[in-house]
Amino acid sequence: MDFIEAASLLDGPLYRGDPDSSSNRQMYAANRERQGSDMQYSKEEIRQYVAEEDIKFIRLAFCDLSGRQKNISIHPDELDRALQYGIAFDASAIPGFGDEVRSDLFLQPDTSTLCLLPWRPDHGRVARMFCGIVRPDGTPFEADARQLLRQAVREAEDMGVTFAFGTEMEFYLFQRDELGEPTKQPYDHAGYMDIAPEDKGENVRREICLTLEQMGIRPECSHHEQGPGQNEIDFRYSRPLTAADNAVTFRTVVDSVAVRSGLAADFSPKPISGQPGNGMHINISAKSADGADVMPLIIAGILAHIREMTVFLNTVDASYLRFGGSKAPRYISWSSENRSQLIRIPAAQGEYRRAELRSPDPLCNPYLAFALLIYAGLDGIRRALPLPAAADINFFTASQQVKERFETLPATLPQARALAAGSPFLAELLPPAVLEYYTK
């Protein structure tokens, strides 16, 4: 089994409840037929599932341009209308989505993403579907990041290239004060891969992983990170849209489990001055239909465009405080295994072979991040860009004379915005509204 076939086994509908119920058996059987495809569930399948699982509310979820999840909840009686016509919302209230002149947009459910929310009540359950965003005439909304990722995937497939992504997500757990407000007091003071009792977050991570598994998302591993109260949960690769949906779901699950535990989760790139920041390392795999090894070309394309793409991977001022310290990269380079590099090729073979991009942080919009990485990789393939020589040096200890030979990532958010604003590559790929949102 190669990695693309393996990734397809991790995609599909997300369900929970009695595994032997007729609805879950039918959903599972249908999933086997849909693996690796964009096939949707029929209205009849959805209706039966909602009725048998006692679902009383259905969240229609989408993301704004920053990657923050939004939703509208509907009653099952409105399900047919949602599936046939979509559900309207006021786009003028979402930054970057438009103004009062053209404010009506519609949420169109992607039925393949139907999923129960395990932390909601067992009676009168709550389900969720991710949605596409369309205009009143049914045409896709140009600033829908999920749709932009779909387009990137289709373009890659037209070139005979199939991508898969996996993320490594870091976050801090902080205590709350007597009023329930978040503090900057870490939940523990454990170190890298410590165990209980020093690692107080062990049970929280366990609950997060179990909740994700109930939703059909399979974490690969979890552990305490370097910072006090800092945690990491990693995911094996999936197809790009599934991986992005899972990244958004992950943040929601972590926040929900943390609140139930009396804690606050923090995904920001630099929660505590002087301590390691939070990263979202992105593992990239690709397979060409003709059997060619396209990974060197993809890496070359990403290296060529990384400076202009950085504002989409690192979206806030604090993102740039993280670069250059605690295993976060600053210099544009690649190497095997070396964790001081921007792109690292881990010591893995076969289906696990991948390139790890280490600069992004968890506040990025995963749909936009994955789409731009695909486009950069495809540009490397089209232009047959040569891969620079591996930089087998430790940038954290190298002399300034050595480091000056390498370009750096943008040092500030304004610098990153300016690079994106002046990029012909991005101007050709992104709708003006999306580019303006990130560069103004």
Can you name each region flagged by the protein language model?
Residues D2, Y15-D20, N24, N31, ...:
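Intrinsic-disorder-associated, low-complexity terminal segments enriched in Asp/Asn/His/Tyr and depleted
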Residues E5-A7, G12-P13:
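Positively charged N-terminal leader segments that act as targeting/secretion signals
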Residues G36-C221, A243, L297, E404-K440:
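ATP/Mg2+-dependent ligation/transfer catalytic cores
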Residues A61, N71-S73, F130, Y172, ...:
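Structured core elements
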Residues D64, V134-P140, P197, Y237-A243, ...:
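A generic structural motif
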Residues P118-R125, F163-A164, S222-G227, G274-Q275, ...:
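Short glycine/proline-enriched loop/turn "hinge" motifs that connect secondary-structure elements
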Residues Y172-I272, P276-A289:
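Helix-rich catalytic cores of soluble enzyme domains
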Residues V257, L263-A264, K287-K440:
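Catalytic-core signal marking the mid-to-C-terminal active-site face
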